[in-house]
Amino acid sequence: MGKCSALMIFLSSSLLLVLQTLHVVNAVKCFGNSFNGNSSTFAQNRQKLFPTLADKVIINDGFYNASLGQDPDKVYALVSCARGYDQDACYNCVQSLTQNTLTDCRSRRDSFIWGGNDDVTCLVRSSNQSTFGSVQLKPPVVWPSPDTIESSKNITLFKQQWEEMVNRTLEAATKAEGSSVLKYYKAEKAGFTEFPDVYMLMQCTPDLSSRDCKQCLGDCVMYFRKDYMGRKGGMASLPSCYFRWDLYSFHNAFDNVTRVPAPPPRPHAQEKESCITVKKGKSIGYGGIIAIVVVFTFINLLVFIGFIKVYARRGKLNNVGSAEYSDSDGQFMLRFDLGMIVMATDDFSSENTLGQGGFGTVYKGTFPNGQEVAVKRLTKGSGQGDMEFKNEVSLLTRLQHKNLVKLLGFCNEGDEEILVYEFVPNSSLDHFIFDEDKRSLLTWEVRFRIIEGIARGLLYLHEDSQLKIIHRDLKASNILLDAEMNPKVADFGTARLFDSDETRAETKRIAGTRGYMAPEYLNHGQISAKSDVYSFGVMLLEMISGERNNSFEGEGLAAFAWKRWVEGKPEIIIDPFLIENPRNEIIKLIQIGLLCVQENSTKRPTMSSVIIWLGSETIIIPLPKAPAFTWIRSQSESGAMSLSDDVFTELSCR
């Protein structure tokens, strides 16, 4: 029975992965000017033209360009199938994609969709302007594999071999050999040191020049590489080209492809012992040489240590600013000298104060080499004790992502516990979003970029990093903004490390900020990635409204937003500075925010779903239900505690 259950789980998981992959590959992108639905002349012309495309592409050697109607409602369509296509497979592929376009892009004039089935890839592209012979490099569609490369793999070696494969495939795909459908296409199969086989496919529409094709494919690779280099495969496409790679064969594209073998291992030293002659008739083998070198090195090391001790006694090392330190897991970081930090901050001068948090004060510092840093000096008795200090040092040392603040090092001399971060010039998000004057600087484009960046940072913590981390204190004051207003998630003192297969944990030690804490965490100490999703939802609603979560007496922002949503008036909560921006896009974010603050944690999305929703104009997003109103219960239970008070307590045993 156990084996049968395990088999059913495996088959269900495999089927789900296949369905996800097919959905990913067949994602239509709608863009450009809008029109008035199916009743418009443009829509009617498109509905007449599209049903003819599948037949036409077959009799035109796999590539067909057509138009129908008169300007300004003229419809242009371009259809293509890949090299070596099966006619039935090509026909079915084009039929499916034209239907997807008609369904998903009812009110947009421009669209493209690269898709496929088991036997072929194909493209359906349409516009109200001629696209033939012109490369189009926006908008991109990028879909990564949901699986990440295991930390046990040699990632550096994998990236090197992956880049080499990209270059080979790109060069071959853009040689423009053959007739229409044979041009600008290359499928390659290669062995990697860390994986048995890697499959890669690149394709452009055959109406382009070789130069345009190379630029287009290069951009596709760039879009994938930028955010998803650690994934086990993925796809990136533009209206004029298509790039996909995976660890398994796809689209029947590799049956007749010769496998490029994995590069040979680096040559080792010859096992045959070589000799060095020292006297006639005598020689020393490598074993003897190694013994001599070891003894010589050991003597030099003793001499060096002696010099260090002598100079240390004379005080010659007092001006050393930092030293490398290794924790119990072998992770290296910098331990800064307290005197150097005191000098950098002008003895923690109030003029250098950047901000005040629940656990300490942050100062700006400048090292003698001109490097600017942010110095967080923990307040004694603040609640962030040794455990939280060591936790933040240990976690941030292992994390590297453009949307996470970078820890440069630490200092723990005497009673002082200090963290040294990269300096982020624009302070934290709360200084902008809740300031009447500065909020106007947060345009719709800037806010969207901040929201998306925070989401990507959380996705990295939850799924993409070598560790699995729950932040537990996500709020606007813990989001720093760099010079270009890109967000960086900060303050990992209360973060919780999960095992790779762990999805949920319980704690008696509750730490965070009331109003941002998920109900199951605040009331029962239950922690999961969905706890961070809840906090993200509250913060997203703050970004849209420009109001603090505690600005609405007795109910909170989520409750207020939900009431307006039910009334059909979600625009009431929109910040007046955003009124002139695309209403549908802003309301979509309100919908996502409400989904993130659902009372039942299983009803909240994952951060990967949030990323997909943010980047798609066509995916149907679920409708939210009433969100959690934990602050109403919490206020009645704990008296006058504010919605924004820091919480650092322990649940009593029951």
From Swiss-Prot:
Residues in the Extracellular compartment per record: 28-287
A single GO cellular-component term on record: membrane
Binding annotation for ATP: 354-362, 376
Positions of modified residues (Phosphotyrosine): 421, 521
Keyword tRNA-binding tagged: no
Cited Gene3D superfamilies: Gnk2 domain, C-X8-C-X2-C motif, Phosphorylase Kinase, domain 1, Transferase(Phosphotransferase) domain 1
Domain of life where this protein originates: Eukaryota
Residues modified to Phosphothreonine: 513
Similarity section: Belongs to the protein kinase superfamily. Ser/Thr protein kinase family. CRK subfamily.
Cross-referenced PROSITE patterns: GNK2, PROTEIN_KINASE_ATP, PROTEIN_KINASE_DOM, PROTEIN_KINASE_ST
Enzyme Commission no: 2.7.11.-
Boundaries of every Gnk2-homologous domain copy: 28-131, 143-250
Keywords of the record: ATP-binding, Glycoprotein, Kinase, Membrane, Nucleotide-binding, Phosphoprotein, Receptor, Repeat, Serine/threonine-protein kinase, Signal, Transferase, Transmembrane, Transmembrane helix
Gene: CRK40
Transmembrane region(s): 288-308
Name of the featured protein: Cysteine-rich receptor-like protein kinase 40
